Amino acid sequence: MPKVRRSRKPPPEGWELIEPTLDELDQKMREAETEPHEGKRKVEALWPIFKIHHQKSRYIFDLFYRRKAISRELYEYCLKEGIADKNLIAKWKKQGYENLCCLRCIQTRDTNFGTNCICRVPKSKLEEGRIVECVHCGCRGCSG
């Protein structure tokens, strides 16, 4: 996710209510970025970053669409400034993608056989006792 660049105009009304949570998530993101990755697989080093990015976008999504606690102006400000991922939120609004973990899991061009990620397979269609872990973001199943 790009570094937050605040525009010249001040944030809209209600920013002070969500700012502490966003600052806390930013701090977690910095810790995840500087965390040593010795002993981890190459792909595992990015999993905490994907998780925090998901949390931040889900926080803004829930405040606006579920709890209706923030204004449209503040929501659009968060999307414009890169605080939340607008493409991920757009997918969450579509049926079947409500719990999507990251956009890489639905991109078919990155796979050998042109399919979705293993975490997108419903648990009912997997073998009993099989532990699924997404290679991209570490998700254990976001399809339900």
Swiss-Prot record:
GO terms for cellular component: spliceosomal complex. Keywords: Nucleus. It comes from Branchiostoma belcheri (Amphioxus). It is found in: Nucleus. A motif (Nuclear localization signal) lies at residues 2-10. Belongs to the BUD31 (G10) family. GO terms for biological process: mRNA splicing, via spliceosome. Its main location: nucleus. This is Protein BUD31 homolog. It comes from the Eukaryota. The lineage of its organism: Eukaryota, Metazoa, Chordata, Cephalochordata, Leptocardii. The keyword DNA damage does not apply. Transmembrane segments: none annotated.
